[in-house]
Amino acid sequence: MNQDDKKKAVAQAAVRYVEQDSIIGVGTGSTVNYFIEALAPIKNDIVGAVSSSEASTERLTALGIEVFDLNSVDQLSVYVDGADEITEHRHMIKGGGAALTREKIVAAVAQKFVCIIDDTKNVGVLGAFPLPVEVIPMARSYVAREIVKLGGDPVYRQGVVTDNGNVILDVHNLKILNPVELERQLNNIVGVVTNGLFAARGADVVLTGSESGVQVNE
């Protein structure tokens, strides 16, 4: 299987975690796009979805799946999303698509977080993939200086504005040995909205697409 085949396989496998008559959380990214397509045959079995990005909202709406504002929903049965990197402890780096803040919010409301990935995303230690940090625009330079103090090399993601109207700093050269602590430290910097470490609340289920099929880690 090539990488796209692996993504399609895990996206299809994630459908079994979707409960009938429920509202589900839907993430953002190339693997999630396949999951949205996989929802088409069962779209009449669910009430609708809460989306983590404008891009996913457009795809869901195009399929005729109702998209709800999170403020009108008490809880979500499941949240399905991908990852840029993930460890055996189910800690992740997310946010390559700049949707990290809404992803983290929707994940917090969900009873179960199902992470769908291909096997290239598995790592021993997080940090080879640059860690995205969403920042209030006026605080960009200050936050960058504070990140340098933590040992990172922040790079401004030129030309990108998040759905929330903010900017992204991608932090390079981090070897993240304690992701829970670094997530907290970064979020404590004034001007940071959130960062792409999903460690304090990691994945509950990981579906990995590989040459041998879909591996399930629950």
From Swiss-Prot:
Residues given in the record as substrate binding sites: 28-31, 81-84, 94-97, 121
Assigned keywords, A-Z: Isomerase
Gene Ontology molecular-function annotations: ribose-5-phosphate isomerase activity
GO cellular component, one term: cytosol
Enzyme category, top tier: isomerase
Record: active site: 103 (proton acceptor)
Membrane as UniProt keyword: no
TM helices/strands, residue ranges: none
GO annotation, biological process: D-ribose metabolic process; pentose-phosphate shunt, non-oxidative branch
E.C. numbers: 5.3.1.6
Family matches, as PANTHER family: RIBOSE-5-PHOSPHATE ISOMERASE
NCBIfam families xrefs: PRK00702.1, rpiA
Similarity section: Belongs to the ribose 5-phosphate isomerase family.
Subunit organization: Homodimer.
Protein name: Ribose-5-phosphate isomerase A
Source organism of this protein record: Pseudoalteromonas atlantica (strain T6c / ATCC BAA-1087)
Gene: rpiA
